[in-house]
Amino acid sequence: MREFTPTTLSEEERQELLGQLRRKEGRWLAWARACQTLLKNGLNPQTLFEATGFEPIQQNQITVAMQVYDSILRQDPPAHVRETYQEWGSDLLYELRELDQEQRSLCAQLALERKLDADQIREVAKATKDFCRLPKQPENFDRHPGDAVAHQCWRLAQERTDLTERSRLIARGLQFAQSAGARALIEALLLDLSGVPSRKPPMLPIYRLETEEDLPRLLPFAGTLPLSSSQIEAIAAVEAEGPFGLVSSPQGQQWLALPGWQAILTAEDPIACLEQIDRLPNAPEGPTEAVVLVVDRADRDWDADHFFLVEQAEGARIQWSPSAIAAPILGRLVLILRPKRVLDEAAIATPWQFEE
């Protein structure tokens, strides 16, 4: 079968390739190269199917298998491997598409040695892919597809309690094991005549903090307003230590834990206190309730865009002013936190009753 490089084809060359595919001249590699050439020259898969009888899924399979075959050639495989796959085996090579060149070559050889079909080589390829993804190569197992399957069987056999299933996995592992170390580990499983594997420890309950909000921030609690300036100033500044935000607590200090919201994280020296919401300037309409005020003592520069905790005659209060505040500023109001809304506590506490 005449081959064409994937450049711009003349109409005569195009018809010649279509005729060769329609008559299925040559072997699968020639078909794959013809399909690739025609597709790269603007023919769509459906039109190619109508002209040749090669379904789109078959076009894709043999084209991908051809690319796998070409990559295997770069690994200089034995002559019988090259020659065999020139004749047949596109379905086997297609299953190796997600492996690297080295593993493709080894799997292709293993498929011929073990006379594996497409379903079996798919399982081998998956085991090989999983094995190569392990952060550390398991001890006593080589980087070979056979040992990858053996490792999979060895691991699963230790988890099975059914003797029949365990025996099947051991037999399969011994069939594929390539290295002496892998074979020895699997043979050791045969010594356990009870068929009940020793119990392994459970998985560790490991979690990882993904965002700043996952890590709460502890704020020293000052009390309920109004407070004197001396009470505000007496609270020691808090500095969280380490990746988990450890806090050393002075004796007798009360604390309030809040989510790691950005407004709180950016505050340099925040403290928390309580106040009735109706006592705040520009308070929203509605029933009164106690709210948490977070105040940053490190920010004492007046700004008309913010509210401040200001020292007054009756004690510190939240204040806003369009012009500079003459009274001592004790800190900037960072946020106001309302309690969780409970719609009807009495209804929640009362069991529901239904009429028959």
Swiss-Prot record:
Q: Is Signal one of the keywords?
A: no
User: Its domain of life?
Assistant: Bacteria
Q: Establish whether keyword S-adenosyl-L-methionine is in the entry.
A: no
Tell me which positions the record assigns to the signal sequence: none
C-terminal beta-sheet: annotated segments:
216-342
**Do you know which Pfam families this protein is assigned to?**
Raf1_HTH (PF18579), Raf1_N (PF18578), RuBisCo_chap_C (PF18087)
Keyword terms, alphabetized = Carbon dioxide fixation, Chaperone, Cytoplasm, Photosynthesis
So what does mutating K129A actually do? Increases RbcL(8)-Raf1 complex formation, decreases RuBisCO holoenzyme formation
Location in or out of the cell: Cytoplasm
Q: Give the region (N-terminal alpha-helix) as residue ranges.
A: 9-192
What does a knockout show? Decreased growth in ambient air, wild-type growth on 3% CO(2). In ambient air about 30% decreased levels of RuBisCO, decreased CO(2) fixation by whole cells. Carboxysome formation is impaired; many small, irregular electron-dense structures are present instead of the 3-4 large carboxysomes usually found in this strain, the ratio of CcmM58:CcmM35 (involved in condensing RuBisCO) rises over 3-fold. A double raf1-rbcX deletion partially recovers carboxysome formation.
InterPro entries assigned to the protein according to its UniProt record, in alphabetical order: RAF1, Raf1_C, Raf1_cyn, Raf1_HTH, Raf1_N
Look up the record and report any one GO term of the cellular component aspect: cytoplasm
Result of mutating R208A?
Answer: Incomplete conversion of RbcL(2)-Raf1 to holoenzyme
* Annotated GO biological process: carbon fixation; photosynthesis; ribulose bisphosphate carboxylase complex assembly
Q: HAMAP family attached here?
A: Raf1 (MF_00856)
Q: How does it assemble?
A: Homodimer. Forms an RbcL(8)-Raf1(8) complex. Forms complexes of many stoichiometries with RbcL with and without RbcS. RbcX and Raf1 can bind simultaneously to RbcL.
Q: What does the entry's free-text domain comment contain?
A: Has 3 domains, the N-terminal alpha-helical domain, an extended flexible linker and the C-terminal beta-sheet domain. The 2 C-terminal beta-sheet domains are swapped and pack against each other to form the dimer interface. The N-terminal alpha-helical domain stabilizes RbcL dimers and dimer-dimer interactions, facilitating RbcL(8) formation. It binds to the same region of RbcL as RbcS. The C-terminal beta-sheet domain dimerizes Raf1.
State its role. Answer: A major RuBisCO chaperone. Acts after GroEL-GroES chaperonin to fold and/or assemble the large subunit of RuBisCO (ccbL, rbcL). Cooperates with RbcX in RbcL folding, plays the major role in assembly of dimers into RbcL(8)-Raf1(8) intermediate complexes. RbcS replaces Raf1, leading to holoenzyme formation. The Raf1 dimer brackets an RbcL dimer, leading to RbcL(8)-Raf1(8) complex formation. RbcS displaces Raf1, resulting in holoenzyme formation. Probably plays a role in early carboxysome assembly; in its absence CcaA, CcmM, CcmN, RbcL and RbcS colocalize in small patches while the shell proteins CcmK2, CcmK3 and CcmK4 are found diffused in the cytoplasm.
Q: Which family does it belong to?
A: Belongs to the RAF family.
- What protein is this chain from? RuBisCO accumulation factor 1
